[in-house]
Amino acid sequence: MTDGLNKAAVFICHCSGNISEHVDIDAVKKTLKAEGISVFDYEYMCSSQGQALIKKKIVEGSLDRVVIGSCTPSKHGTLFKKCIQETGLNRAGLEIANLREQCAWVHPDRTGATEKALSLLRAKLKRLENVEPLDEIKVDIAQQALVIGGGIAGITAALNLADNGVSTVLVENNSSIGGQMAKIGKIFSPDKLAEECAMCSLSPLMNEVAAHPKITLLTRTEVESLSGSAGNFTIRLRKKPRYVKDSCTACGRCSRVCPVQVEDEFNCGHMDKKAISLRFSQSVPKIYCIDPDYCLQLNGEACGKCADACKNEAIDFSQKEEIVELNVGAVVVATGFEEYDVSQKPQYGYGIFENVLTQMELARVLGINGPTKGELLRVSDFSKASSDPTPATCDSRCEDSSDESQGTDTPKRIVMIQCVGSRDEKEGGNRYCSRYCCMAALKHASLIKKKHPETEITICYIDVRAFGFYENYYRAVQETGVNFVRGRPAEVIEKPDKSLVVRVEDTLDQKMRELPADLVVLSAAMVPSPGTRKIASVLNLSQDESGFIKERHSKLKPVDSSLDGIFVCGTAQSPKDVTDTIAQAGLAAVRARAFITDSPKVLDNEIATINQLLCTRCGECLKCPFDALSVNESGRVVLDPLICTGCGYCTKLCGEGAVQIAGFTKLQLKAEMEGVLEEGDVLGFVNSGIASLTCDNIGNSVLTYPSNVKLIKVPTGLVVDRDLVLHAFRHGASSVLFVEDPPDNPRAEVIYPLTVSHFEELKEELGDSGNRIYFKKAYVPNTKGLAGTFTSLAREGEMIR
């Protein structure tokens, strides 16, 4: 690109005051214009009008370099790249200065924020002086999608994709799809002011999945790893055996003769099942499954009764685990939630007192195929029976509970405690509202009142959050005689007869109350399932501080994950009810289909480049931990762009400087340092992955740090050598901090130890100056700790300044 600054311009976004209220944009413009730089500002640079302004000025001024001062590049980086490319400008000619998350939002001092904004813009201008055009790398996108999780979100996404012609693989780690919705018995219908059978809605969809020609269903299967790049992901799956062939007719003979009883997780442990069983009566696929942890035959004891009983010869003890590899263009994550572990709140007696349940456990008690066959009983009053191998199906009985009685009294007094583990800033709690708990309590209260109007029900609440049409449902439940006490109970006490007392302060009349109860039901928070936490790690997806998978932008890209080509929906993304889950799953499917059909795809080519003139064929770079480099037939080192992660380890290995990362060359990094640094500054080299997101989240979390902390994004700290660190010191840096991704995903598990070793080597190489470099592992939830590190180092820098 041309030399000099006459072909460059700066565009500054006000961001509706998010930037302009903290940064004096007029002062920034005046200073830059005095330096001979064209500067333009607009209220919303990301809007169609803002983009039109950028394109107009590029064409009018024959610009070949553009700096946009706006929010973090992770929000609108792709949008702005497309914007400038529409004018014919190479995307390498764009730099985005983060004036919001890493300036305006973290520096309350307007003068300091303005000075830093100037330095960030100057740094990007300097960086562009050394830019080289990036060639486009195009690849065809695999025409297959993967949906992870077989609950209502995964089912909805898979059917939407398949119905629109996309070949889809649906993976579920349990023996049946259905997820949590299969357990809840009833769903509330606010428009009808009634409750409806959940399985009546879910079961047809499950069967549609099984029969769909475009869907491959893999149960008892987990995702082990992901490699490749967006549009061409290689997914490695581990499929566990059922020990039952597909020829199983689900007659139930095997289960009837099985001598082993195990706790039934589907019924929350309040019922037993056999070691060979269906997960529930409407399971899909409707094939029995043997639990290898409890099966006598699989644990070396002579049994085989199930095999003897099976007339279809479907029992197969020889089945082994399988490894399945898929090539997919897009992934939808729908791994769901689990209930908060309410035993973390021992004051409520869960796990101590028999008659304290969660709402999910109550749902199973009220279910016709639950431990009491739908009869409302205290746990202490019913015996733990084995599940029927051919239990009740979803027929007319879903509108009525069983007439069978276990000869005990229905609980006369029930107390429900809301927000257990949510809206709770104490240890073990979660700050967020789980959104579904209030409605679940109202639903169960309504169901019980309709069948047992004499039962007294009291709901202890902080606020009843019933939005939209749900307010009508809330009022309808109130009219049935359900009592509401505003207050968070202090404790639950058990009496000798197993009855309970709930102590609570009613904050409306400011009186302490002792509420007698035969049954206490805890509305537990919705937390990420183990599968959600695991898949976020395996796929290297950003998570919020609570462990839910974080969307790229809550408004503009609510189902896009932090990685291109991977989408998230349902309760894997945040707490929500069935209605919102289905809506979001449909959107995720639309986004995944659009991504797959947009073929060929232009790759992000911030990957390794090899200068063949400098390369001595020493072979050191072939130690790439991802095997992205190889030697071709002519003896040249070549790169596989689909494998290269752009980590920069090869740049460290190459002693000739023949390998560099496109967009992060030494010249570019040095120029950016020269533009941003002043005497006494703290310079942070920030990994462009999780670490960069964590830095952005400092601003999102309304935390602050001094304005003499300057951050430069790098692929990883491996691209920063001794020469670059010394360059930083020569240009005023008091200290240099390496901020790296934690080793909590497969890629980072490889790279993190390399960055640690590299850092230790640098300290040694730098001698006395090694005491001025620091290393920080950045977890997304630890924004406060990272801000504290910045502040501590900045104070040392102020002393030098």
Swiss-Prot record:
Give a yes or no for keyword Plastid in this entry. Answer: no
What Pfam families does UniProt report for this protein, alphabetically?
FAD_oxidored, FlpD
Keyword Iron-sulfur present in the record's keywords: the answer is yes
Instruction: Describe the reaction catalysed, as an equation.
Output: coenzyme B + coenzyme M + 2 oxidized [2Fe-2S]-[ferredoxin] = coenzyme M-coenzyme B heterodisulfide + 2 reduced [2Fe-2S]-[ferredoxin] + 2 H(+)
Gene Ontology terms: cellular component: cytoplasm
What GO terms in the biological process aspect are recorded for it? methanogenesis
Name the UniProt record assigns to this protein: Ferredoxin:CoB-CoM heterodisulfide reductase subunit A
